[in-house]
Amino acid sequence: EIPEQPNVEDKHLAVEQDNRNLINESFRVLRTNVDFILGNDSKKVVMVTSMNQGSGKSFISANLASCVALRDKKVVVLDLDLRRATLSKIADSPKLGLADYFNGKVKNWKEIVTRSEDNENLDVLPVGTMPPNPTELLLNKTYLPDMIAELRNEYDYIFIDCPPVDIVADAGIVSKYADMTLFVIRAGLMEKSLLH
């Protein structure tokens, strides 16, 4: 359980190297649980999604990725919520990003990698230009699978921030490339009976 953090700006990470407050310790516990579930080194792609908007999945994606990177692991987080680009704010929302790579405007994904200002081991692949056709871009048979395969060779961990599963098909498309799916559920936003 990650406690609510009302005073954190959208673009800043709450996780800090030497901070032992409740939110930092909660992310360390989550990091340990994710490592336990993933098991071996070949499994490293974690998709983060939710059932509905406003659950805090982008906050969880960014801070969990940052927490893992604090262990001197090379980590990348992909903003594949191509409709909202919330996670891209930690990279100051560059003009070029994944949408531009998927539609062929950018030839190599390495051109759009943005280093986090808060953590030198954390890279971000932002959305870039907001596309009119996000689902169609993700359905492309080469860009996403080829990029994920290359990222597996470059990074120790890959976190993918996806839109909520109950709203659009995007998370279902991306899930086949993930080794693990982490569902974020915000207290008071979803009825407990829907979790079964």
Question: What annotation goes with each model-predicted range?
Answer:
Residues 4-6, 19-196:
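P-loop NTP-binding module
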